[in-house]
Structure formats: structure tokens, C-alpha cells
């Protein structure tokens, strides 16, 4: 079957080629015999790409000069639909989504954003076909295996929100490994929302508060918005400033219902 690659993939390939070329340009002039024609051709090839890179960096610098969000959350959906529209298996879309995480973490880190929450897998997602669920779990394990050392090197802190005890053993162990390895990092904190549902999170918090009231650890009058917030998975993390849904749907899908009361939606 002939696959019509979409422009996002083509652009990504161009970016990779450009980065490689820019990194090896000095080596290029050292190891190759000097030929003016080669030099001119290579310089002409690099000029527009250097300008693009400079433009992107200027945009980042411009954003950093203004107030930026402390906490961005992303509902990572639409991957399956993206693949189906191109005649590809849904797994190809999920793989593209996982690959995009690297770039998302990089840009948030460069901008100085302190918290990034990614909605990777909801409690409702277990209802999807078994093969699709297995693919998503395998991709997460693959990503953490491949990227963990680099994330740690770049001072990224990995945390989770959701009931990870119900995850397949290999996924649970890989997540625990990532959390433990990056525990003391001080860069951007990436919260992976996996087996997460906001309603069940609120129920969990209410039960814990009720237990404390029943055991006299808390007085009824002490219950306020902050106390409830502190008993959520996100306790101690500021509420999101911005929520992005990549698939384009205008719904919250049981994500951070308590925390996004004043969040900008995009």
C-alpha cells in the first residue's frame, strides 16, 4: 500500500536533517578537501535553515520575556483518528503521539514552565480494544526505556497522577523506575496522568477526608477548598493555567475537573 506521508512528518524529517547539518558544519570543513563549489553549495543549503532556527529561537526568547504559565496540561487525544484518516493503523497514530512528547518536554523546559501534565491514559480507556490498550502501554514502556537517561540528564522530574497500581506489571515497574530516578531533579515536573479519572480522584479525596473526620484527625470546620485540593493526586501542584486538547474536541473528558476551574482552554 502506498502511504501518503503528511506534512507534519515531512517537516519533522526536515528539522532533523537541519539539526544534524548545523551540528556537523564545522567538521564538514575540517575533514573534507577544500573546494569552493562544495563550500558555497553547503552554505546556500544552510542559510534558510539557519534563519528558521534563529526565528524559532527569537520566538522563544520573546515568549520568555513575558509572563508565562506555571502549569500547562495537555489532553493527548486524536492520535487514532489522525492515523485512520491516512489509512494507517491506529497504533501508528499513538506512536506519533508518544514521539511528540520529547519535543513538548523540551520546549516547556526551555521556556521555564515548571509543571507539565500529560493525559496519557484515562480510566475509561480500558474499554478500548485490548490490542490498542496493549499498544499504548508498550509504547509508554518503550519511551521511558529510551528517554529516561536523557530526561534525568536534563533535570526533568517525572511524577504520576492516577491509580498506577492497576497497570500491567511491566508498565508499573518502568514508571516507578522513572519516578525514583528523577525524584530529586529540579527542572520541569512532568506529571503523567495514567489510569486517571477526575471523578474517581474526587471520590478518593472525599473518602480520605471523611475517614479523617471520623477518626477525629480533622474537624468538619477545617474542610475548605485548599484541604480538598491537598487530598487530590495534584496536591502541592498549582492549578493549570492552560489546557490544550490536541484532537480539537471541545470537552474536558473527566480530566482535572476540580483543578481547572479558572484554566484557559485551547
What does each of the following model-derived ranges do?
Residues 26-266:
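Flexible, compositionally biased loop and terminal segments
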Amino acid at each position: 500500500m502506498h502511504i501518503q506521508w503528511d506534512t507534519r512528518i515531512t517537516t519533522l524529517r526536515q528539522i532533523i536533517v537541519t539539526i544534524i547539518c548545523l551540528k556537523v558544519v564545522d567538521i564538514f570543513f575540517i575533514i573534507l578537501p577544500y573546494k569552493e563549489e562544495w563550500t558555497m553549495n553547503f552554505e546556500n543549503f544552510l542559510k534558510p535553515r539557519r534563519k528558521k532556527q534563529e526565528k524559532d529561537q527569537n520566538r522563544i526568547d520573546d515568549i520568555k520575556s513575558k509572563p508565562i504559565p506555571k502549569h500547562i496540561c495537555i489532553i493527548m487525544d486524536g492520535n487514532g483518528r489522525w492515523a485512520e484518516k491516512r489509512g494507517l493503523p491506529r497504533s501508528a497514530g499513538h506512536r506519533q503521539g508518544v514521539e511528540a512528547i520529547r519535543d513538548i518536554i523540551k520546549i516547556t523546559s526551555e521556556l521555564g514552565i515548571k509543571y507539565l501534565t500529560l493525559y496519557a491514559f484515562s480510566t475509561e480507556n480500558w474499554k478500548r480494544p485490548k490490542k490498542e490498550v496493549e499498544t499504548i502501554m508498550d509504547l509508554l514502556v518503550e519511551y521511558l526505556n529510551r528517554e529516561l537517561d536523557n530526561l534525568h540528564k536534563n533535570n526533568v522530574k517525572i511524577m504520576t497522577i492516577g491509580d498506577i497500581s492497576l497497570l500491567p506489571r511491566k508498565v508499573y515497574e518502568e514508571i516507578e523506575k522513572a519516578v525514583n530516578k528523577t525524584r530529586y531533579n529540579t527542572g520541569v515536573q512532568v506529571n503523567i496522568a495514567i489510569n486517571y479519572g477526575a471523578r474517581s480522584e474526587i471520590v478518593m479525596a472525599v473518602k480520605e477526608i471523611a475517614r479523617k473526620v471520623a477518626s477525629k484527625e480533622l474537624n468538619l470546620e477545617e474542610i475548605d477548598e485548599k484541604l480538598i485540593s491537598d487530598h487530590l493526586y495534584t496536591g502541592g501542584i498549582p492549578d493549570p493555567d492552560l489546557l490544550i486538547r490536541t484532537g480539537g474536541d471541545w470537552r474536558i473528558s473527566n480530566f482535572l475537573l476540580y483543578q481547572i476551574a479558572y484554566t484557559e482552554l485551547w
